[in-house]
Amino acid sequence: ICRDTDAGHRELLSAVGEVTLISPFEIFAQQLNAAIYTPLLRAWEDWLVGDDSVDLEKPLRPPRGDWVLCGYGRMGQALHEALSTHNVEFSIIDASGEPQDGDGRRIHGHVDRRTLTDANLSGAVGLVAGTSSDEENLRILLSARTVNPDAFLLVRQNHHENELAFNAAAADLIMQPSLVLARHILLFLL
């Protein structure tokens, strides 16, 4: 079992032989989808792998509705694909260029108060700060709170050493790719 990071990595590992590749972003997208539409099942899976933060009587319930995706890399694309099955509408903000595919509003630029307003964050139920930069993701959270303090805030934490900063930011849900993989493998082994 190996972490699927990109096309080059997949190609390299395919030469090794039988290797099961797991993408933390695809797994997380499925988990978020489950948390929105079957929250108790999602909470039960987390409880099985020993997540101390799980409350089976009050499972995490990300809201249904329109979302803003900040960053349309591997995580943003996986979330877009998984949640589109339920006709979730997205506004996508990405600085690296126009998103290649997907429906909804696409905004090219860095995430700031203006682009969040253009993406209609004030009318959205949630925001995903899903870039590959922890600093950028924290900055996105702070900007998002000024536009819609009631939005469900989901953030990607890339490096464990930034845990204190992410906990202080008080996002509704923190996604750590390495933790997603570890828990998925543990659940697979149970």
Predicted region positions:
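Cytosolic regulatory regions of ion transport systems
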Residues: 1-190
